[in-house]
Amino acid sequence: MSLLTKAAAEAWGTYLRQRDERCEDAIRCDYGVFQFRNTVFQKTLSMLQGLYLRQYDPPALRTYVQRHQGTTVALRNPANWFLVMREQAAIPQIYARSLAADYLCCDDTLEAVGVLAVRPPDSDLTRNTKQAQELPCVLMLSHYGTVYVYDWETDGLYEVASDIKAFSKNGLLWCEYVYRHPQTPFATTEPRYHVQKFLCTDPTDAAAVAKTAREMNGLNLVIRTPGRTEVEPLLMLGSIEGLRACRPFDHMPAADFRDLLNFIRQRLCCEWYVVGLVGYYLAYGPFVPSGMVLLDKFGVVYLHKIEDSDLYRIADNFHMFLKCGLLKLRGLCRFDRGLRGECRLEELPVCHHTLKRDVLRWHGALGTITRSQLESALDWFLRPTRGTDKVPNNSSAWGRTDLLPTGALQDNQNWAFPSHSVETLPALQGGLWEDNDETTQTVDGQRCFRMPKFFPPPMCRAPYNECGVELPGGDSSDEDESGRPRRIANRIGDTPETPCNSENEDDTTVEGTSGGPEAMDSQAPYPSEDSPTTEKEAWLQRGRRAKAMHARGHTLKQVPIPEPDQMGDDGPDPGP
């Protein structure tokens, strides 16, 4: 029997420790779960009240952090994570840096309040109950009370809560680093045999993960996303052939399907592997996919959304995907420096700054909130009867928001840890925050740069009016001689017309195809490089390609995927 890798062994141990064989009805106990969750919220908010009362007063906040430097505060989600108070001058990774100007989409000011730490798990027999391990994460507050976490290991800034009250309710649920930590429990645990097979696989070996998925072809993985009550099926495929046999890909013309494979290859700048499709099942049987889960050669997990036919990073590896699910596409906001967000293929973060300023301004509270007002609000949020007077009437809405999918959290009260006498071990000081290369440089001074996208017209034979009557001129100028939609690129300035990027790549063999598309120009306008050997090299290639496309005013060529109402029952339309 072959030995498991270190990552697989850690994941397997975490999975086994969180198993709870009790029936779900005994675990949930809806009213008890709601009351317990409210108790945890009030305990967390009471320990963060020093930050809550000073969140709109930066000088008072800095003085408070300096006075309580080294104090640990218990957090939630996960329950064994803590905040170690520390001023910004004592954190070299952020000292004398303007994180708001380098990362955020809008101007703001960020104040550091401390670093995060984690206590060893209860199952660790050698652990010291008086120690906690610091992590490469800094908790920060903005001028408008928004809570951020800066991860200097991956050089990312996460918006984890809109205010401290929401932070006390959800904890670190929206912090990406949580799901990279080996102690974080898995959200996806069923079917048990399927999950066990993946946990025994090296998460950095994309070919092995795809092979495991291929062995389960046609089966479903129950994907759970933390903070959400509904589940989603992941239909296992594991191969290009299996993908081609599923709708809507089986109704795509061969040329369009080949273009889709080449688009993914050129977007990733490396080889890739299919895992499966996420979506939902109709009552009468058919599976309606919303995206394709795939891996690059380094094991990073991406989702190709059918809605806009583009790729988005959803996890660093498949083990992390089993912990976070689709959280990165359900509201997790990550801000990157310079071009790195485009290089990592992160989804464009949603800007909440304008909305929050407008809300404060509408209530006449912009820059006028006093400490006495915050004290009154805190008195209301911490009222003793909140656990009973806020019980919802609809029991179906009582979904858990805790990371632990069972009642195991009740066995480990996160405020019972002796936080007044904790010794913290320093975290690793290195990380991507030290990088200063092409991926960290801005493009024309743009923040949160992403390549603009072109959405192709619908795949229909002829234009119709709103009543369904065919209009004259079916062979319009929007389609070329082959009947396929003509590529239209939005351009900046007066840049001359140039073919889109996927037509200018060097010939590349893609899994499931015999070769790449033919180049339309005698000389490719974008740099063509060798296959990367590290993820950092892939980032550099993606960044150079994005800058070259931006300089020429090109957009991403989206490959049209047929909608359900455009698919007949006789297979793919051969075209006119």
Curated annotation (Swiss-Prot):
A GO cellular component annotation in the UniProt record: viral tegument
Entry keyword Aminoacyl-tRNA synthetase: no
Keywords: Virion, Virion tegument
Presence of the UniProt keyword DNA-binding in the record: no
Biased composition regions of type Acidic residues, renumbered to the chain: 566-576
InterPro entries attached to this UniProt entry: US22-like (IPR003360)
Compartment(s) of residence: Virion tegument
Ranges for region Disordered: 471-576
Biased composition annotated in UniProt, kind: Basic residues: 542-555
Annotated signal peptide: none
Similarity comment: Belongs to the herpesviridae US22 family.
Protein name: Tegument protein US22
Source organism: Human cytomegalovirus (strain Merlin)
Gene: US22
